[in-house]
A protein has these predicted regions:
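Basic, Lys/Arg-enriched alpha-helical interface segments
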Residues: 1-69, 78-82, 88-118
Length: 118
C-alpha cells in the first residue's frame, strides 16, 4: 500500500502495454519500482545511472530467465514522481541511439508540461 510520502510512477511510454515479460521478471521490476517510490537509492546490479540521457536518469536491469532476455527500464527521479521513460529488450552492449533520443524527448515533454503548470 502506498503512503502519502511515496512517489507515484508516471508512465511516459507510447503504449499502455508492457513487453512480454516473464512472471518473475515482472515481480522483480515491481519490487524495484516500489523501493524507488519509497525513496530508496538503487545500485548495481539492479540499477545504474544513464548520464548520456540526463543527470536524473537511470536504468533498471532485469534479467528474464523465463524468456531468456534482459530488459532495461529507463526511469527518471523527479521531486514528485518516478518517471518511467522507456522499457526495452537489451540486445547490444550499448543503449541504441533511438532509445536515448526517445527518452530525452519524453523527459523534455514532461519538463515542458511541468513548467506550464507552475
Amino acid at each position: 500500500m502506498m503512503s502519502q510520502d511515496d512517489k507515484p510512477l508516471r508512465w511516459m511510454l507510447d503504449t499502455l502495454t508492457s513487453p512480454p515479460v516473464g512472471k518473475d521478471a515482472r515481480i522483480e521490476a515491481g519490487f524495484l519500482f516500489r523501493l524507488l517510490q519509497r525513496g530508496e537509492s538503487l545500485r548495481m546490479p539492479d540499477s545504474r545511472p544513464m548520464p548520456v540521457i540526463g543527470r536524473r536518469v537511470h536504468e533498471l536491469r532485469i534479467d528474464d530467465a523465463e524468456r531468456s532476455v534482459s530488459w532495461r527500464i529507463g526511469y527518471g527521479i523527479d521531486d514528485d514522481a518516478i518517471l518511467v521513460v522507456d522499457w526495452f529488450e537489451k540486445k547490444t552492449p550499448t543503449t541504441p541511439a533511438t532509445v536515448i533520443a526517445r527518452c530525452r524527448r519524453r523527459l523534455r515533454e514532461y519538463d515542458h508540461g511541468q513548467e506550464e503548470t507552475s
